[in-house]
Amino acid sequence: MDLKTAVFNAARDGKLRLLTKLLASKSKEEVSSLISEKTNGATPLLMAARYGHLDMVEFLLEQCSASIEVGGSVNFDGETIEGAPPLWAASAAGHLKVVQSLLNHGASVNNTTLTNSTPLRAACFDGHLEIVKYLVEHKADLEVSNRHGHTCLMISCYKGHKEIAQYLLEKGADVNRKSVKGNTALHDCAESGSLDIMKMLLMYCAKMEKDGYGMTPLLSASVTGHTNIVDFLTHHAQTSKTERINALELLGATFVDKKRDLLGALKYWKKAMNMRYSDRTNIISKPVPQTLIMAYDYAKEVNSAEELEGLIADPDEMRMQALLIRERILGPSHPDTSYYIRYRGAVYADSGNFKRCINLWKYALDMQQNNLDPLSPMTASSLLSFAELFSFMLQDRAKGLLGTTVTFDDLMGILCKSVLEIERAIKQTQCPADPLQLNKALSIILHLICLLEKVPCTLEQDHFKKQTIYRFLKLHPRGKNNFSPLHLAVDKNTTCVGRYPVCKFPSLQVTAILIECGADVNVRDSDDNSPLHIAALNNHPDIMNLLIKSGAHFDATNLHKQTASDLLDEKEIAKNLIQPINHTTLQCLAARVIVNHRIYYKGHIPEKLETFVSLHR
C-alpha cells in the first residue's frame, strides 16, 4: 500500500496515532501534498468529517493545514455525492461536534455540493435537528435551494421531519416557495403522506398552488395514494367540488394500478359518482370523449352508479377505466399517464397477451413523443422495452412456444419512431442532445435493425426498411466517443443496451445492411478510429473482410498511429486470417513514405489524393 492510501485510510478510520507516525518524518510540503491528495475522489479531511472523527479533523486542520473547503465524493445510502465539502458531510452524517469544530475553524456555512445542496439541507434531509439549529444560529441561509429549486423546508416536509419543518417556519422559511417544476412544500407533504406537517403549513398560510404539470397538492396525494391527505384536503375550504371529484377518481385509479386493490378503487369511484349527482339541479357529468381509443380496447368511462356497479364483474374493464381517468385528469404530458399505460401493457405481456401489450405501448410511445423533449429517458425506456419484447417473442416463436408472431409492420413501426426521435434531437440545435442518451438511442436502433433482419418481408417492405435506414444514416448521428452507427454495429459494447439481452454485437448482418444503405466505411471516431479499427479491437475477421471489400482503407492509422492490423489480438485467429499484404497497394506505400518523411504535399497533389494521404498520417 502506498503512503497516500495509508494516510487516507488512517484518516477515514480515525486512527490518529497511526497517521501521526506516517507523517512524523515528512517535511511540511510533503505533509501538505499528502493531505490535499484525493483517493476515490475524497480528501482525508472529508473522510474524517464524514465518519465523525473529531480528533482527526482537528489534527488535520491544526497540524497539517488541511483545506477546510475542498469538496469531494462521499457516499450516503448507496448514492455518491459529488463536490461535498467537509461541513456538508459532517452535517449529513449527524456529527454535531465535528460541525461545531469545522465552523469554529472558519468553514463556510453555505458552501454547497455540485448539485447546490447546502450543509443545512443535508442536515434537514436526515432529520438532524440539533445540527439544523446550530447551522441556522451560525447564519446558514434557509432559502438556498438545490439545482432543482428544492429548499430545506421542502425536503424536511418530504422526509416527514416535523420538528425541523416547524423550526424552519419559526425562523421565517418561505412557506410558498416554488421549485423549478413549480411544486411547493405542500406538494412534498402530499407526496410523502405527512399530514401533521401539512396542517402546520396551512397554519402558516400555505397556498394550494398548481405545479408545472397542473397538479395541486390534493392531486399529488391522489397519485401517490395517501388516503389520509386526500380525506383531509377533500374537506378543506380551499377545495372546490370538481377538485374533490377529480381527486377521488384519481385515487381510485391509483388503487387499481399501484395498490392493486379493485374494491378500494370502487369505493372511491362510488364516492365521486355520488358527488357528481348530489345536486340534481347541477349534475357534473364526465366529458364526452371525441374518439374511443383502440389501445384501451375502445372502452369509455362509466357515467352512472349503475354502470359503476357493472364493473365489479369485469376486472379488465376496471383497469381500462383507471387508464382513462388518469389520462383525463392528469393529461398526456404527466409522466404517470404514460407510465401506467406501459405498466398495464407489461402485465398483458406477462400473461401472453402480446397484442394488447404492443397496442398500449405504441399509444404510450406516441404520447411521450408528442409531449416530452427529444431523447427523454422515458421515451428511450419505451423504445428499449419494445426491442426486448420483440426479441423475446422471436426467440419463443423459434421454440414453437407462441402462436403470436412479430410482424414486420410492428417492428418497422418502432424503428420509424426511433429514427424520428433521432431526427427530433438533431433538429433541436439550441439544446444539443445528451451524448449518452443519443448513444443509447442509436444502440436501440441497431438492435431493432438486427431484429428486422430476422423477420421475413416482401420486396416492397424490404425497400421501405432500407429507405428508412438510409434516412437514418443521412442524419449523421454520433454516439459516445463520436461513434457512428457503423462503429456501434462492430462493437461488442453495443450488446449491453438494457437489462435483458436483445441482439449480440458485433453483428455481421447489421454491418452489411448499414453498408448497403450508404454507411461510410472510412468514417472516424474521436480517436480517429475507423469502423475497421473497432472491428479489429473486437477480433471479428468476417466483419473486417466485409469492410475491406466495401472500401475500408486497410492501413489507415488512428490518432495513436495504429492501423487496424496493429489492434488485432496476437492470440486470436483473426490475426492469421487478415493478411496486410493482400490489402496494401503501391499507392498506400507511397502515402506512408510521404507521411513518414514529412514531405509537404498540400497544394501539390489533387485534393482527392490529399485526403488519401491524410488517412496514413
Curated annotation (Swiss-Prot):
GO cellular component: Cul2-RING ubiquitin ligase complex; cytosol; nucleoplasm; ubiquitin ligase complex
SMART domains: ANK
Any Pfam family the entry gives: Ank
InterPro entries named among the record's database cross-references: Ankyrin_rpt (IPR002110), Ankyrin_rpt-contain_sf (IPR036770), TPR-like_helical_dom_sf (IPR011990)
ANK repeat extents: 2-31, 40-70, 82-111, 115-144, 148-177, 181-210, 213-242, 481-523, 527-556
UniProt pathway annotation: Protein modification; protein ubiquitination
One term of GO molecular function: ubiquitin-like ligase-substrate adaptor activity
Chain positions found as N-acetylmethionine: M1
Biological process annotations from GO: proteasome-mediated ubiquitin-dependent protein catabolic process; protein ubiquitination; ubiquitin-dependent protein catabolic process via the C-end degron rule pathway
Keyword Transit peptide attributed: no
Keyword set, alphabetical order: Acetylation, ANK repeat, Repeat, TPR repeat, Ubl conjugation pathway
TPR repeats: 245-279, 338-371
Protein's UniProt keywords contain Transport: no
Entry comment, domain topic: The first seven ANK repeats at the N-terminus (1-242) are essnetial for recognition of Lys/Arg-Xaa-Arg and -Lys/Arg-Xaa-Xaa-Arg C-degrons.
Purpose of the protein: Substrate-recognition component of a Cul2-RING (CRL2) E3 ubiquitin-protein ligase complex of the DesCEND (destruction via C-end degrons) pathway, which recognizes a C-degron located at the extreme C terminus of target proteins, leading to their ubiquitination and degradation. The C-degron recognized by the DesCEND pathway is usually a motif of less than ten residues and can be present in full-length proteins, truncated proteins or proteolytically cleaved forms.
Similarity comment text for this entry: Belongs to the fem-1 family.
Record text on subunit structure and interactions: Component of a CRL2 E3 ubiquitin-protein ligase complex, also named ECS (Elongin BC-CUL2/5-SOCS-box protein) complex, composed of CUL2, Elongin BC (ELOB and ELOC), RBX1 and substrate-specific adapter FEM1C.
Name of the protein in question: Protein fem-1 homolog C
Species of provenance: Bos taurus (Bovine)
Lineage start: Eukaryota, Metazoa, Chordata, Craniata, Vertebrata
Gene behind this protein: FEM1C
